[in-house]
Amino acid sequence: MNILDQLAEYSRLRVAEDKKKISLEEMKNIAIQTKNEKLCDFAFEKVLKKDGLSFICECKKASPSKGLIEPDFRYLEIAREYENAGADCISVLTEPKWFLGLDEYLKEIAKTVSIPCIRKDFTVDEYQIYQAKTLGAAAVLLILSLIHISEPTRPEPIS
């Protein structure tokens, strides 16, 4: 099993545990009720479509290839520095096992900065898309090889 398969399998286990706490239907309802100004007027899409280069800067504590990157992970400080430097969007790692990410990183960063945030995780279930919205994400990373569908589909709008 390659690393991507391992990440996906661990993600499936995490989702199964999360669903024991909050069902898919409940998570959908929470996501629908969650207000996120950064989703209004397609803020994420707009920053990517603007003239010139768009910058998506990443907050990452560790990785499988590098190990621990930032022992003293001052993620809020890093996010503010990215925004002040002109980032258009911030990508936040939430995968806990290999990247040492936390959902709280995304939640707190999204509350702190005025630019859109992406949840960077190994999305294997629609549950994670709704969950991402409740955490403040304006977008999620999708790796099609991890999703068991014949072609990409778009979930119902939840903004």
Across the structure, where does each feature detected by a protein language model lie?
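Single conserved hydrophobic/aromatic residue that forms the stacking wall/gate
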Residues: 148-159
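An N-cap/entry alpha-helix motif that binds or orients negatively charged groups
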Residues: 2-70
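Conserved residues at the C-terminal ends of beta-strands
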Residues: 10, 93, 143, 156
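Alpha-helix-loop-beta-strand connector modules within alpha/beta enzyme cores
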Residues: 101-118, 150
